[in-house]
Amino acid sequence: MSDARNVAVGVEEEFHILDLTTRQLVPRAEEILQRLDKDSFSPELLKSVVETNSQPTVDLLALRSNLLDLRRRLAEAAGELGLGPAASGTVPILDMDLLDVSRDARYEQMTEDYQIVAREQLICGAQVHVDVADRDLAMAVVAWTAPWLPMLLALSASSPYWLGADSGYASMRTLVWQRWPTAGVAGSFQTAAEYDQLIADLIKSGVISDPGMVYFDVRPSAHLPTVELRICDACPDVDNVILIAGLFRALVGRAIEEIEAGGQAPPPRAELLRAATWRAARSGLEGDLVDIFGAGPVPARAMLRRMLEEVRPQLERYDDWELIDNLAEQAAGRGSSALRQRRAFARRGLLTDVADLILAETRDVPPAGASLGVAPAVSAPDQIAPILLERYQPAGYDEVVDEHGAVRPQYRAVMRTLERLGPDTLDERVGAREAEQTDRGITFRVNGDSASRPFPFDIVPRIVAADDWAVLGRGLGQRVRALEAFLHDVYGERAAVADGIVPPWVVNDAPGLRHGGRAPGRDAIRITTAGIDLVRGGDGGWLVLEDNLRVPSGIAYAVEGRRLAESVLPELGPPPGILRLGTVPALLHDALVAAAPPAVTGEPAVAVLTSGPADSAYFEHAMLAEEMGVPLVEPGALLVDDDVAYRVDDGRRRRVDVLYRRIDEDELFAAPGADGAPLGPALLRAVRAGQVSVANAPGNGIGDDKVVYAYVPRMVTYYLGEQPVLDDVPTYVCGDPEQCEHVLANLDQLVVKPVDGFGGSGVVIGPHAEPYQLTAVREQILADPRRWIGQEVVALSTHPTWHDSHLEPCAVDLRVFVYAGVEPVVVPAALSRVAPPGSLIVNSSQGGGSKDTWIPRR
């Protein structure tokens, strides 16, 4: 078998040259090339294009660094002339009358021979070269790789605009390119000699003048032992080039292994290959592609995943699997360049915005390695983002800017990108984000509002270090296991009370204690979903702030926040190596299935239970139901008959085994069902009978009680025999006379909270409170001390947040979600909640917003 580790790959990229003032394609490549070396930079057919040639290498990261360096040098040389390179299949603004072919005898003869076909080649591509042992092997490889070429084209699609108008295609370049008489699907050849004879016959016929004019989608090199991929558009995002190069090398490697094993390439029909290529050019990543062998339509993202699995053995042998898998996830999440260009145009209807996007994506890339999760070395960190950070003055621990005013290493690439975009562009992107949110219904209702509003998503992402995430994962899994044990104990023997771990009054007086909490069986999972809120203190360490065990919300907003960020700010998409969010709905569905009662046989029927569109988080309910593929049900559509729960739809009953409850249990149990009777009694009987599960379980509110919070560290030791991994905020229980005395004596230094408060309501922050507020809360504590707790003030960490065209240091917390099946699973998505400027309350119900949260893999 060939040594996979020594297969070199190289890339040729073509770049349009645009005037940075008019954004128009201009014939000034020769001026730029005079400033660059001829080994790496060369002219093309038209004077408006420059080609770069990478060094062949076996290392994709080295290839990436080389491509970035070539782009940087080209951009610098062009920039000195007021020009910029644009890596895309086509550009939106051009005047054909101003363009001409390069001064080269071969190119001039091609123009004479082919006329308009040559003159209209206002296109750019990216070509990948992979080493093979000889040209005979290269010819054999061509047939093996052919079925996957349309997928690679779809990944590269970057040419929706042609001659100033939307072509309706994702890759208009493909249609223009295929007008050459020798472009498109290669024929079937057994040997290089057969192929060479065809070339000789074509030259003899006068159709072409030399072997270089054979423009098949994949071909052997005319002068090197390589196989060349030529089907792809030029890609603005250099990581897309690396993705395509890595996949193509793996396809070649797989083909060689099959050939060496005596395999024969399955013969796809040329007609289907042409159809598949057309479909990829038409749809890009946003539609279906053609399954060459099944001949049916397949979603592009599903085809990409199939391709990855097909060549995974080769990618693993090249040590490329993790990189390519991450880049594929990034590409699928961001969508094609064609999609991003159309979105840019849709915002204001300006083709200049499309050109600016292409220029920015071509030029504005982090230093080599930065987008792969490696912080670049910086000699002068204090000079990063000097404009955006000019007025940025955090009062305490800031997660992005250190105490000396320097940007922390993990945020340098982020801040550079934001600085390059500048305030005006960032304001435009905020407007585009709000418009897209409104169109997609990503809303939330703030307390006191009669209508929903777009959920505030900040454009500056937050990064949680991989080591921090590992500690949080251990600590939160431990915490949920202890709380699960406590809930079973509270509604069972109450051993923790008998053993003095929790005072009796804490349980008996808890607002969340419910008689219906005894309905689930001893083996039931009570905490199917938990949302644990954490903060970083003044030293940067993590503290648990609150447990949410009833109807924790926010996971859909975390997922949609990522999608919005990738849509409206593609220059700042999460780099490879960041945990994906695409698995979140499946993880939730798995947890809900695990919560099914023992009476269920077969696949449990799951439904999301909502109070309806008036609910503040209805968007989340609907989104989760849709992405899990389960029905969204309101109480009025539920019927319990003979201890079995049904949803009634169009007069038909359909059994429900698991109800994912996104409604307060008191409201649910009082609501009339499909038969007009209150649901509570019948639904609880069904739960007791083991015929239906309600997740989260009734009565869970005692587990997230603010007094109970003070005893969770003891529970960890008592139930699990372990020491807590995570610390809590120091808490004083006013139901304890000594602790109450301390709270009353230090009201102006503490945060006091009502035990039954929700969403930040009733909270008084002593250092920020007015005297009358302190007097009022003192009277309330004295009147009913068991209803109050006091906590030490935690100087919440701050994070740069875009507000009124500048960055403000705003307080942030982190809601981490834990799904409990057989064992708790910490979901690879977190909601970073951000307070309004000047506030410490991050709750969305009080006007807080959120940030996209990047969690690197370890």
UniProtKB/Swiss-Prot annotation:
EC number(s) reported in the record: 6.3.2.2
Annotated region (Carboxylate-amine ligase), positions in chain: 1-372
One Gene Ontology MF term: ATP binding
Residue segments, region Unknown: 373-858
InterPro entries named among the record's database cross-references: ATP-dep_Glu-Cys_Ligase-2 (IPR051680), CP_ATPgrasp_2 (IPR025841), GCS2 (IPR006336), Gln_synth/guanido_kin_cat_dom (IPR014746), YbdK (IPR011793)
Assigned keywords, A-Z: ATP-binding, Ligase, Nucleotide-binding
One BP term from GO: modified amino acid biosynthetic process
Coiled coil: none
Leading EC class: ligase
Reaction catalysed by this enzyme: L-cysteine + L-glutamate + ATP = gamma-L-glutamyl-L-cysteine + ADP + phosphate + H(+)
Role this protein plays: ATP-dependent carboxylate-amine ligase which exhibits weak glutamate--cysteine ligase activity.
Family, per entry: In the N-terminal section; belongs to the glutamate--cysteine ligase type 2 family. YbdK subfamily.
Protein's name according to its UniProt entry: Putative glutamate--cysteine ligase 2-3
Organism: Frankia alni (strain DSM 45986 / CECT 9034 / ACN14a)
